[in-house]
């Protein structure tokens, strides 16, 4: 592996080969309601 990227390689890269993907949240943060429910469940 070279330390510097190969500019010729970058320039000939074809962006059209990339396909658009839908971004999916792998680990969505819980809502405030969910957190409150879990707190209450833990206390009882």
Curated annotation (Swiss-Prot):
One of its GO terms (molecular function) is actin monomer binding. The keyword Membrane does not apply. Residues 1-25, 33-44 have a biased composition (Basic and acidic residues). GO terms for biological process: actin filament organization; regulation of cell migration. Pfam families: Thymosin. It is found in: Cytoplasm, Cytoskeleton. The modification N-acetylalanine is found at residue 2. GO terms for cellular component: cytoplasm; cytoskeleton. The modification N6-acetyllysine is found at residues 4, 12, 26, 32, 39. The modification Phosphoserine is found at residue 31. InterPro entries: Beta-thymosin, Beta-thymosin_sf. There is a cross-link at residue 12 (Glycyl lysine isopeptide (Lys-Gly) (interchain with G-Cter in SUMO2)). Keywords: Acetylation, Actin-binding, Cytoplasm, Cytoskeleton, Isopeptide bond, Phosphoprotein, Ubl conjugation. It comes from the Eukaryota. The keyword Ribonucleoprotein does not apply. Originally found in thymus but it is widely distributed in many tissues. Residues 1-44 are annotated as: Disordered. The modification Phosphothreonine is found at residues 23, 34. Belongs to the thymosin beta family. Plays an important role in the organization of the cytoskeleton. Binds to and sequesters actin monomers (G actin) and therefore inhibits actin polymerization. Seraspenide inhibits the entry of hematopoietic pluripotent stem cells into the S-phase. This is Thymosin beta-4. It comes from Oryctolagus cuniculus (Rabbit). The lineage of its organism: Eukaryota, Metazoa, Chordata, Craniata, Vertebrata.
């Amino acid at each position: 592996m070279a330390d510097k990227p190969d500019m010729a390689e970058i320039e000939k890269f074809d962006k059209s080969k990339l396909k658009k993907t839908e971004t999916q949240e792998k680990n969505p943060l819980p809502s405030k309601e969910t957190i409150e429910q879990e707190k209450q469940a833990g206390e009882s």
